A protein has these predicted regions:
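Hydrophobic alpha-helical transmembrane segments
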Residues: 95-129, 136, 246-339, 516, ...
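Membrane-embedded transport module
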Residues: 273, 304, 311, 558, ...
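Alpha-helical transmembrane segments of multi-pass membrane proteins
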Residues: 64-84, 100-110, 129-130, 260-278, ...
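Acidic, divalent-metal-coordinating active-site segment for phosphoryl/phosphodiester hydrolysis
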Residues: 527-529, 535, 547-558, 595-603, ...
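Non-lumenal N-terminal regulatory segments of integral membrane proteins
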Residues: 1-140, 146-149, 154-162, 167-248, ...
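Cytosolic catalytic regions of ATP/NTP-dependent phosphoryl-transfer enzymes
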Residues: 210-218, 333-511, 518, 531, ...
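Helix-interface capping motifs at the ends of transmembrane segments in multi-pass membrane proteins
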Residues: 73-98, 261-299, 312-322, 501, ...
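Soluble-to-membrane junctions at the N-terminal ends of transmembrane alpha-helices
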Residues: 44-76, 118, 140-141, 201-210, ...
């Protein structure tokens, strides 16, 4: 079988009939019985995104990350020092075993969450299907792109994603954006084989008659023959040879920043602890083991699992709310947006446009205007938008009562068309009636129709389009716009030659016959949704290509501030600095081109905003790409769905509000873990540094630090499912390493103060009371003193770490004003009780733990209570000073 390149070259060189015969197809498409044969012969239209990871690889990736690599190195060093280099009979692998167990538990939980996440993502991706229109057995069918086979004849129009590598059989003003393959930002015009001026066989990407999978139709229409599918396509070849690089999201960048910050801090603290203990005790081997254990205590090894669990849980919940997350990390970015830019149509309005009035130039009802509009909408083969459908629907209703609009599809047939594009903002069809008269009918934005018309028609008379008539038309249309009606102009020219080759230059010297007034009423949910988004700290800005008067009328009805509207023509004269100021004070932008929309979003981002963009059209794709979060709907054109990070199954701002809230919950619970864990761990390290300087022995055995870290991490498993205060959800939040360092600096030392208080009580009161004497270095009872002391701080550390979770998880009073999830209560209580019971369990001798007296537990209760009260007091000061919590 020929290679994909040979197939493409052959199609350019040989007669079309030869190509059709080779693939056993016809101009009217494949026969149904030939489809499966071609699929078996040439393969499926699916690009392999790299081989699916094996279970072994997934397990490896779940376990190995910067934090666990550090832990495994520590485990190895501990094994060498405590087992390999230990004296006979003194081998103790406990620390190494516990560290490895810690890594396996963290990795195992993450692996399970990743599997759940992958399954959820797979289920969600099946909800979003891109389709293509093919000819089979002579009739048009819309099928999923992955069902296309070599030999299929496909119909392409503006907004479509080209579904395979194809050769063009027929085309009209066909422009394709293929920057993803060539890097060329400008759209490229393509032509069918019969019209192409030669073919470039050296660089197939530059061929006029070939179009490639994954590129997008910007304007025009074409019929094409599928030559290459799936992995054999140009895009498939690229996917197989390079690793696709995705620009990290703001969330990913901040998480990487935080991870390396913690690693750097650990790399500083471990040597400091090692040197101090080595100089104090003189036992450098024991000091090394202890310093490594401190490293374990500083490592938030559950962070990857917490992130995965939070994102997976968020995506599943959001799917139930009709929000499909294409990229998991987009969940947090969605929650962080403070500005939502959106088009007007279908978002603020019902997306069910009704043609209210077909009017002549003086504003009187005129069915001849409807007649010509129908010819334009019915016979055009591009993307029939909502206004086309409204025109056809109104004509079908009127045809039951009026002969002038009856059987038009039988009375006329199409000769040619000039497809819509965003530069001209109009489209034309050339039709011939049964009497042989040929005419061009054009509809489009009124300003553009006036620019190509030199005459107007009124009650059958053709008169010049004078300035007075133009002013009358504009005044009439302005009144309609102020009522919220969208207006299109309709012009025509007749007595054309059907054998002519028509182009956009023929759209001139036309007769304006009238205009069409459409009603697209606001959604009942639009005003409440905009208000709700505002309550969550999100400003809604409207970016539309529509008329400013219509936009103003609709925006006023939904409660948006429209005291000032910025037009696309204004943007063209503004510098970047002027635009940066204007975007802050302007809510509504009208008559925009796609590039102007993207420029506004980039300006907002440069001003420090997190911007989401919601759209569903071809012209929305550039804006979605440059925004922080691209949002589309399942009914959008292919290019919009392909570009989006988030897809709504219901085009409603209320649905988006639910997704935004869930994104903030994900952020909140991940932030809780990071801030609470790191501040608590650093508090312990400061305590250890103090103890290393002033105590004649280690305050906690290395194995105690490891167990403490293991149990604490298990207690944090429920944090992704914790409740989040409603007040916290009202504002957008972004990740800041500076905020984490500030949090550590405020709350780490509080933990140290009460640890030191515990040292004093244990050293001078509790342990001497239990043993009947104080610490005597080198005495036989010194070992017992150390074990009891270490047991006391071991238990106090666990209680302080778990109970402070409830103090720090919310700025409010715990259990009274803010209630944690039951799972958080259960896991934290279990961790504290479990560690408290260890000295009385069979593990006591292995872990070198001892019983404690009743006075200890009374003082423990007092210390933990004072600690929680102190944290609450400092929390109040912190919030007052920095106006933030998590």
């Amino acid at each position: 079988m020929s290679t994909n390149k040979e197939r493409l070259i052959a199609a350019l060189q040989e007669p079309l009939e030869t190509t059709l015969t080779r693939y056993k197809t016809h101009l009217d498409g494949l026969k149904e019985d030939q489809v499966e044969e071609n699929r078996d012969l040439y393969g499926e239209n699916v690009i392999t995104k790299g081989q699916e990871d094996s279970i072994i690889k997934k397990i490896y990736e779940s376990i190995i990350n910067p934090f666990t690599v550090i832990l495994l190195v520590i485990a190895l060093v501990s094994f060498i020092t405590n087992v390999w280099l230990a004296k006979p009979g003194e081998e103790d692998p406990t620390t190494s075993i516990i560290i490895v167990t810690l890594v396996l538990i963290s990795g195992g939980i993450r692996f399970i969450q990743e599997l759940r996440s992958d399954k959820a993502a797979s289920n969600l991706s099946r909800m979003i299907v891109n389709t293509a229109t093919v000819l089979r057995d002579g009739s048009e069918q819309e099928i999923p792109i992955d069902e296309i086979v070599v030999g299929d004849v496909v119909k392409l129009s503006a907004g479509d994603m080209i579904p395979a590598d194809v050769v063009l059989l027929d085309s009209r003003d066909f422009f394709v954006q293929q920057s993803g393959l060539t890097g060329e930002s400008d759209a490229v015009e393509k032509a069918c084989l019969a019209k192409a001026d030669g073919q470039n066989l050296e660089s197939l990407l530059e061929s006029e008659s070939l179009a490639f999978m994954g590129t997008n139709v910007i304007s025009g229409r074409a019929t094409a023959l599928v030559l290459v599918v799936g992995d054999d396509t140009m895009m498939g070849a690229i996917e197989q040879t390079i690793n696709t690089y995705d620009e990290p999201t703001s969330f990913e960048r901040e998480m990487n920043s935080i991870s390396w910050l913690l690693i750097r801090l650990m790399l500083v603290m471990v040597p400091v602890v090692f040197v101090i203990n080595g100089l104090t005790d003189g036992d450098w081997l024991e000091a090394g083991v202890f310093a490594l254990s401190v490293g374990v205590g500083l490592t938030p090894e559950m962070l990857p699992m917490i992130i995965t669990a939070s994102l997976a849980k968020g995506s599943i919940i959001m799917a139930k709310e009709k929000v499909v997350i294409k990229k998991l990390n987009a969940i947090q970015d969605l929650g962080a947006i403070d500005i939502l830019c959106t088009d007007k149509t279908g978002t603020l309005t019902q997306d069910e446009i009704v043609l209210e009035y077909p009017l002549d130039i003086h504003g009187d009802l005129d069915l001849s205007v409807l007649r010509r509009a129908y010819l334009n909408s019915y016979f055009q083969t591009g993307l029939k938008n909502l206004m086309d459908r409204a025109i056809i629907s109104r004509t079908e209703r009127e045809a039951k009562k009026h002969d002038i609009v009856r059987d038009l599809d039988q009375t006329f047939h199409k000769i040619d068309e000039l497809p819509f594009d965003f530069e001209r903002r109009r489209m034309s069809v050339i039709v011939k009636d049964n009497d042989g008269f040929v005419s061009m009918v054009t509809k489009g934005a009124l300003e553009e129709m006036l620019s190509v018309s030199n005459y107007v028609e009124y009650k059958g008379d053709i008169i010049p389009l004078t300035d007075d008539v133009r002013d009358e038309v504009l005044a009439e249309v302005a009144q309609l716009n102020e009522q919220g009606l969208r207006v299109l102009g309709v012009s025509y020219k007749s007595q054309l030659n059907e054998n002519d080759v028509f182009s956009v230059e023929d759209e001139s010297d036309m007769i304006l016959t009238g205009y069409l007034a459409f009603l697209d009423p606001p959604k009942p949910s639009a005003a409440p949704a905009i208000k709700a988004l505002a309550e969550y700290g999100v400003t809604t800005k409207i970016l539309t290509g529509d008329n400013d008067k219509v936009t103003q009328a609709v925006c006023e009805k939904v409660g948006l501030d429209v005291t000032h509207i910025l037009l696309g023509s204004d943007l063209d004269t503004m510098s970047d600095q002027d635009l940066a100021k204007a975007v802050e004070t302007t809510t509504v932008f009208a008559k925009l081109s796609p590039d102007q929309k993207a420029r506004i979003i980039l300006s907002l981002k440069e001003n420090g905003h997190k911007v989401g963009y919601m759209g569903d059209g071809i012209n929305d794709a550039p804006s979605m790409k440059v925004s922080d979060v691209g949002i589309s709907v399942d009914t959008a054109v292919d290019i919009a769905k392909e570009t989006a990070d988030v897809i709504l199954l219901d085009k409603d701002l209320m649905v988006l509000e639910k997704g935004l809230v869930e994104g903030r919950k994900v952020y909140a619970n991940m932030t809780k873990y990071i801030k609470m864990t790191v501040s608590s761990n650093f508090g312990n390290i400061f305590s250890l540094l103090f103890a290393s300087i002033f105590l004649p022995f280690l305050p906690m055995a290395p194995v105690h630090l490891i167990v403490l870290n293991l149990v604490y991490d298990i207690s944090c498993i429920a944090l992704p499912f914790d409740n989040v205060d409603k007040e916290f959800l009202k504002e957008p939040h972004i990740w800041e390493a500076k905020s984490i360092m500030r949090f550590i600096a405020w709350f780490g030392p509080i933990s140290s103060v009460f640890d030191i208080l515990t040292y004093i009580l244990l050293y001078f009161i509790i342990v001497p009371m239990i043993l009947g004497h104080g610490y005597v270095h080198g005495s036989p009872e010194a070992v017992a003193f150390i074990i009891i002391f270490q047991t006391g701080w071991f238990i106090e550390s666990m209680w302080s770490q778990t109970m402070v979770i409830h103090m720090l998880r919310s700025p409010k009073l715990p259990f009274i004003q803010s209630h944690p999830a039951l799972s958080v209560v259960v896991t934290t209580l279990f961790a504290a009780v479990f560690v408290t019971s260890l000295p009385y369990s069979p593990l006591a001798s292995l872990l070198k733990l001892s019983h404690l007296n009743g006075l200890y537990f009374i003082l423990l209760f007092v210390i933990i209570t004072l600690y929680m009260l102190s944290v609450t007091f400092v929390k109040h000061i912190y919030i007052k000073k920095y106006k933030e919590w998590l």
